[in-house]
């Protein structure tokens, strides 16, 4: 895990000072939390994992045949984040949109069973809930782990009605003053549009509520001025290339300046 911010500390190397400043700021933010209520706004989806053995190729095409052995269904995207926050003892209030289909209702049921607050989730008629299915296979009898064979997405490409977005944003705005933190979880599916994200950030600033953003790389403008931004290391490397930066640290500094972020937290995936 790597952290960058704009602060500097006398007597330390540049890298040590950056980490020191970020940790101290995070410590202050945690100490200043007024309540355990965390507002989370973003895209909600379902993740499905189909496991099996891929021992043979199809006779009519050079593709593996997966013999299913098990499958797992779980909440994904912002819903997964909400569950994680609750597991840390925080009281997450998730605001998002699902369709009035089996997948959408299943997401609500799973979250409610785990005690996640779902009153901020709108169920839209005639809308399909996003489902991402991954087919994972391995050769039977081999020690080597599974490999991803295919990802199959079910998505509704029709824009979410403006009235639904406006209602969602305004309900969230009403809850900001009594919250300890606002998290924007943007997967580019339409829940966080430009105007909605800007309004949420402005209101949070007015009430001194810190904002954390997990942005889509193609929607960084929707996180302008937030306190903390989360990036995967692969995402930072991609942005380094786009920006023509020499190092990840240089790219991080450019992103902080361009987007008026206070801190950038780089996650190293399975390496922490």
Q: Where in this protein do the model-derived segments appear?
A:
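Structural beta-sheet core signal
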Residues: 40, 94-96, 213, 266
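Short coil-to-helix leader/linker segments, especially the first N-terminal amphipathic alpha-helix
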Residues: 4-32, 202-204
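Generic enzyme active-site microenvironment
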Residues: 41, 183-184, 212, 230
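Short amphipathic alpha-helices and their capping/turn segments at secondary-structure boundaries
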Residues: 23-38, 171-174, 203, 215-222
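Conserved phosphate/ATP/ADP-binding segment of small-molecule kinases
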Residues: 191-272
